[in-house]
């Protein structure tokens, strides 16, 4: 995905466009973030640090995923006042998270002028069966996935950007790698299939046939795909780009580290120069202590990625 041509948008009527905002417009807005880093922030000061480091957008939160894991309880949409304060402090786009299936939280976020909504498994799901109908909103939505079928189901619902779910708040990139390799592996298989095999494959992965065929023709997802969940170092970020992602979300990895400003700049540089080992070595030096990671082999660790299908 990284380093390929312009991301195609739907032109064949595959997705129903609402009067609120055509899907192609939302896909175009998401595409503007391609090649960038989106950073979680919990206050205006952190937002300014992220912007100065070169982030293409920030995610406004009350608690970063590492704190959500540590503190437990029910994680909900952030206070709209905090989101407004963060939005007023920067000139780059601001995202915010809504609970899976909680369309009223999404309505509130749209009403306060947020730029993108992340329907996120990091927050406690509000609906175990249904995701938000994202076609009912003007603003673009981001959704997570673990595999190609999940990605295409979210796109059918109106997601304009897909990210790996990974395991946010762990500082451990293994699940993000697993998820992007799963998506990319299925796309490689799909590209080599005869057209008459696509029906069976679409049924197997429980994805809409027209989107599966479009993915086959494009050789990639029809929307931008970012990496998320456990990215903590410049090397992690470059790894995800080399695996084919269009950009990177960084959550706890920046502001839970020893020198957030320096690490933020380094990760932005790593995403920009992801294929240059000399540059990656340079930006990886002297960053201070990385966030404390979590071993995902521990069965007691809650898997956020399993909260939805």
From Swiss-Prot:
- GN (gene name): PDX1
The catalytic residues are 97
The protein's matches in InterPro entries, at most eight in alphabetical order, are given as: Aldolase_TIM, PdxS/SNZ, PdxS/SNZ_N, RibuloseP-bd_barrel
> Where does this protein hold D-ribose 5-phosphate?
40, 169, 230, 251-252
> Any idea what job this protein has?
Catalyzes the formation of pyridoxal 5'-phosphate from ribose 5-phosphate (RBP), glyceraldehyde 3-phosphate (G3P) and ammonia. The ammonia is provided by PDX2. Can also use ribulose 5-phosphate and dihydroxyacetone phosphate as substrates, resulting from enzyme-catalyzed isomerization of RBP and G3P, respectively. Also plays an indirect role in resistance to singlet oxygen-generating photosensitizers.
This entry's comment on induction and repression of expression is: By stress treatment with salicylic acid and ethephon.
The molecular function terms in GO held by this entry are: pyridoxal 5'-phosphate synthase (glutamine hydrolysing) activity
Its recorded name reads: Probable pyridoxal 5'-phosphate synthase subunit PDX1
Q: What is its EC number?
A: 4.3.3.6
Q: In which pathway does it act?
A: Cofactor biosynthesis; pyridoxal 5'-phosphate biosynthesis
Family label: Belongs to the PdxS/SNZ family.
* Coiled-coil segments: none
- Key words, A-Z: Lyase, Pyridoxal phosphate, Schiff base, Stress response
Misc. remarks from the entry: Vitamin B6 is an essential quencher of singlet oxygen in plants, that can protect cellular membranes from lipid peroxidation.
Give the record's GO biological process terms.
Answer: amino acid metabolic process; pyridoxal phosphate biosynthetic process; pyridoxine biosynthetic process
Q: One Pfam family from the UniProt entry?
A: SOR_SNZ
């Amino acid at each position: 995905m990284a380093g390929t041509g312009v991301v195609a948008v739907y032109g064949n009527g595959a997705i129903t466009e609402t009067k609120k905002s055509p899907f192609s417009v939302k896909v175009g807005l998401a595409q503007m973030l391609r090649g960038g880093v989106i950073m979680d922030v919990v206050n205006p000061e952190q937002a300014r640090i992220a912007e100065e480091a070169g982030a293409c957008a920030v995610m406004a939160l009350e608690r970063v995923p590492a704190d959500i894991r540590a503190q437990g309880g029910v994680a909900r949409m952030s206070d709209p006042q905090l989101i407004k304060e963060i939005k007023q402090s920067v000139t780059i786009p601001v995202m915010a998270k809504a609970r899976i299936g909680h369309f009223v939280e999404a309505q509130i976020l749209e009403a306060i002028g947020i730029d993108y909504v992340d329907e996120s498994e990091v927050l406690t799901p509000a609906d175990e069966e249904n995701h938000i109908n994202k076609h009912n909103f003007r603003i673009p939505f981001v959704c997570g996935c673990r595999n190609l079928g999940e990605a295409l189901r979210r796109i059918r619902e109106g997601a304009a950007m897909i990210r790996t779910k990974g395991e946010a708040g762990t500082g451990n990139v293994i699940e993000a790698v697993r998820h992007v390799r799963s998506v990319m592996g299925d796309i490689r298989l799909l590209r080599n299939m005869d057209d008459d095999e696509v029906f069976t494959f679409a049924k197997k992965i429980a994805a809409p046939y027209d989107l599966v065929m479009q993915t086959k023709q494009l050789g990639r997802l029809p929307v931008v795909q970012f990496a998320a969940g456990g990215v903590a170092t410049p090397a992690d970020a470059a790894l995800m780009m080399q695996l084919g992602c269009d950009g990177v979300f960084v959550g706890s990895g920046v502001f839970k580290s020893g020198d957030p400003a320096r690490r933020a700049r380094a990760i932005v540089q790593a995403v920009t120069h992801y294929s240059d080992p000399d540059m990656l070595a340079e930006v990886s030096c002297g960053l201070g202590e990385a966030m404390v990671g979590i071993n995902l082999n521990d069965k007691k660790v809650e898997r956020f990625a399993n909260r939805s299908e």
